[in-house]
Amino acid sequence: SLMVIAPAHHRRIQAGILSWGQDMDQQHNPFQCNLGYQVSLSGKGEWNKTADYVGKAALEKMKEELKAGKKPYKLQLVGMELGGKPIDNYAPDFWLVSPESGGDPVGFLTSPWWHPEKKTNIAMGYVPFDGTLNANGFPKGKVGTKYKVHLPEQYSETPGTPVDAVVVDIPFKESFNANTREVVK
């Protein structure tokens, strides 16, 4: 018998729904993977959660460092639109991201896929955190920052040549009914 078990991969990525083990794991903190609004902590974006919870002291310290303009971690999850041939299969490994000018990799893609409505590849991935915060003080990627992505040959326009990529907001497309994450971004 056939039954639906999950959203289509491009819809998951489009909505910014994270996959445990692919987009985040126990080595990531909530701020790093765009879940800071969950820490805030009614989930509405304010910084006044009074209840105690595991890791509260570390997250409160990180919150203060972010507010002070410090960078308590190196990589931030971002959305990207990128070139190349349509990505139509799951990435068996992370694909490297380099600065626009080239050079050594500085990050990696976690979830790439072809977006049929946008007619381009979209992806979530980690790039250097530059300290950009949204209006509510939560970390985010700097929209418009350009990178190069090293795709496997099957998706590369020219084998061995990285494709252009640009940081965009997550979710990639606004929801019909905005959720808390979209409201506080």
Q: What label would you give each PLM region?
A:
Residues S1-K185:
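Conserved, structured C-terminal
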